[in-house]
């Protein structure tokens, strides 16, 4: 079984509790407002419900609240909202809209849903898909594959809807990418103070897989899954 987002989040949550005397943590009141000011909905949700977004640069770290605390039991059927989450992830990677996902895209699709599959797991899945499904996965196959994982491992995980909502709040101009200025503004809102341009550029360089100087949704998912 691949590594799940919930494990690093729990580790970082413990680290946050150990270090909160030396860092400024985003605090939320009973009404759900951050002490540093009222945040937009998805950003506030993320601040309340995540442990730590990123831990690259010390003062540029963003500490976020742990959560997504709905305990899900494996001995039940998928709920409608969980099926919709699977459908949304499937649509994201059904690039030519033919109703199939290529097995090469399955790893990124799983990461979008909050799973960090190992290389061995991806190899095994690819072999299974190539042997039994002709190298492509339709939605029913996808539900059969991902449903048990969703039932067994989604407690404390970041779902695709939460990631997409948060990405939209970072991507203020709606062009599908997060720029240096957009990331700096989001961090200012979460931290309550401005982060230096050089620090922001370092963060973007670290997560910018294609080297275009901006963060797209796939790169954002990887950043949030660290």
UniProtKB/Swiss-Prot annotation:
Post-translational modification: Phosphorylated. The phosphorylation regulates the activity.
Lipidation, N-myristoyl glycine type: 2
S-palmitoyl cysteine: lipidated positions: 4
GO CC entries: cytoplasm; cytoskeleton; Golgi apparatus; perinuclear region of cytoplasm; plasma membrane; postsynaptic density
Domain EF-hand positions: 81-116, 135-152, 158-193, 195-226
GO biological process per UniProt: negative regulation of protein import into nucleus; visual perception
GO terms for MF: calcium channel regulator activity; calcium ion binding; calcium-dependent protein binding; nuclear localization sequence binding
Sequence positions that bind Ca(2+) 1: 94, 96, 98, 100, 105
Membrane topology reported for the UniProt record: Lipid-anchor
Residues the record lists as binding Ca(2+) 2: 171, 173, 175, 177, 182
Record flagged with keyword Transmembrane helix: no
UniProt keyword list: Calcium, Cell membrane, Cytoplasm, Cytoskeleton, Golgi apparatus, Lipoprotein, Membrane, Metal-binding, Myristate, Palmitate, Phosphoprotein, Repeat, Sensory transduction, Synapse, Vision
Domain of life: Eukaryota
Localisation: Cytoplasm, Cytoskeleton; Cytoplasm, Perinuclear region; Cell membrane; Golgi apparatus
InterPro entries named in the record: CaBP1/2/4/5, EF-hand-dom_pair, EF_Hand_1_Ca_BS, EF_hand_dom
Modification Phosphoserine occurs at: 179
Binding-site positions, Ca(2+) 3: 208, 210, 212, 214, 219
Keyword Metal-binding part of the UniProt annotation: yes
Known function: Modulates calcium-dependent activity of inositol 1,4,5-triphosphate receptors (ITPRs). Inhibits agonist-induced intracellular calcium signaling. Enhances inactivation and does not support calcium-dependent facilitation of voltage-dependent P/Q-type calcium channels. Causes calcium-dependent facilitation and inhibits inactivation of L-type calcium channels by binding to the same sites as calmodulin in the C-terminal domain of CACNA1C, but has an opposite effect on channel function. Suppresses the calcium-dependent inactivation of CACNA1D. Inhibits TRPC5 channels.
Domains (record comment): EF-1 binds magnesium constitutively under physiological conditions, EF-3 and EF-4 bind calcium cooperatively and EF-2 binds neither calcium nor magnesium.
Binding partners and assembly: Homodimer. Interacts (via C-terminus) with ITPR1, ITPR2 and ITPR3. This binding is calcium dependent and the interaction correlates with calcium concentration. An additional calcium-independent interaction with the N-terminus of ITPR1 results in a decreased InsP(3) binding to the receptor. Interacts with CACNA1A (via C-terminal CDB motif) in the pre- and postsynaptic membranes. Interacts with CACNA1C (via C-terminal C and IQ motifs). Interacts with CACNA1D.
Protein name as annotated: Calcium-binding protein 1
Annotated source species: Bos taurus
Gene encoding the protein: CABP1
């Amino acid at each position: 079984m691949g590594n799940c987002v919930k494990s690093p989040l729990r580790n970082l949550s413990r680290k946050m509790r150990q270090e909160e005397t030396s860092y400024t943590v985003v605090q939320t009141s009973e009404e759900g407002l951050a002490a540093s000011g009222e945040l937009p909905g998805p950003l506030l949700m993320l601040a309340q419900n995540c442990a730590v977004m990123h831990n690259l640069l010390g003062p540029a770290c963003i500490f976020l609240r742990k959560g997504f605390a709905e305990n899900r039991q494996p001995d039940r059927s998928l709920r409608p909202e969980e099926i919709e989450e699977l459908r949304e992830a499937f649509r994201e990677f059904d690039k030519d809209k033919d109703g199939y996902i290529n097995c090469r895209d399955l790893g990124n699709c799983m990461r979008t849903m909050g799973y960090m599959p190992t290389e061995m797991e991806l190899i095994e899945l690819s072999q299974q898909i190539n042997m039994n499904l002709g190298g492509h996965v339709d939605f029913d196959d996808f539900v059969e594959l991902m449903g048990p994982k969703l039932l067994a491992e989604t407690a404390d995980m970041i779902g695709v809807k939460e990631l997409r909502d948060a990405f939209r709040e970072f991507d203020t101009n709606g062009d599908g990418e997060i720029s240096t200025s957009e990331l700096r503004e989001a961090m200012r809102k979460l931290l309550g103070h401005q982060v230096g341009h050089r620090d922001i550029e370092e963060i973007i360089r670290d997560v910018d897989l294609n080297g275009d100087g901006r963060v797209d949704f796939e790169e954002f998912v990887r950043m949030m899954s660290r």
